[in-house]
From Swiss-Prot:
Protein name (database record): Pal-related lipoprotein
Principal location listed in the UniProt entry: membrane
Signal sequence, renumbered to the chain: 1-18
Keyword field: Cell membrane, Lipoprotein, Membrane, Palmitate, Signal
Residue positions of covalent lipid attachment, annotated as N-palmitoyl cysteine: C19
Membrane topology: Lipid-anchor
Cellular localisation: Cell membrane
Lipid-acceptor residues (S-diacylglycerol cysteine): C19
GO annotation, cellular component aspect: plasma membrane
């Protein structure tokens, strides 16, 4: 008699515990985790091209001393998939060994404000 009441309760407990386990989400993997070498990333927006002029000037100057790194730079026109790292565009970011080592975001007045931090990282 007691088994008739216990058996259905055990089935319900196992069924409900299986449901809660299936709702656990795996840890979200960042796109930075896929970058294992020094990589320059530039996030651009054609609607804000006037804000990007110092970035382009800085990149042209940096290309003289670091042509290989600038040539391998990746340019994105959307921040889709990068929301955890990028708040606004334009953004110039240097990633090394899955870590952001330099990030310059938003409106920058002088190209030197971009060149100096990048030179520091790229010269290593």
């Amino acid at each position: 008699m007691r088994y008739r009441a216990v058996f259905p309760m055990l089935i319900i407990v196992f069924a409900l515990s299986g449901c809660t386990l299936s709702t656990i989400n795996p840890m979200k993997k960042s796109r930075i985790d896929n970058i294992h070498h020094t990589q320059i990333l530039f996030f651009s927006d054609e609607n804000q091209i006037d804000q990007e002029a110092p970035y382009y000037d800085a990149l042209l100057d940096l290309e003289k001393d670091y042509p290989e790194q600038i040539d391998k730079m990746k340019v994105y026109d959307k921040k889709e998939g990068w929301e955890d790292e990028i708040e606004t565009v334009p953004t110039l970011m240097v990633v090394d060994q899955r870590h952001v080592v330099v990030k310059i975001e938003g409106c920058v007045k002088k190209k030197e404000d971009i060149i100096k931090p990048l030179q520091h990282v790229l010269s290593k």
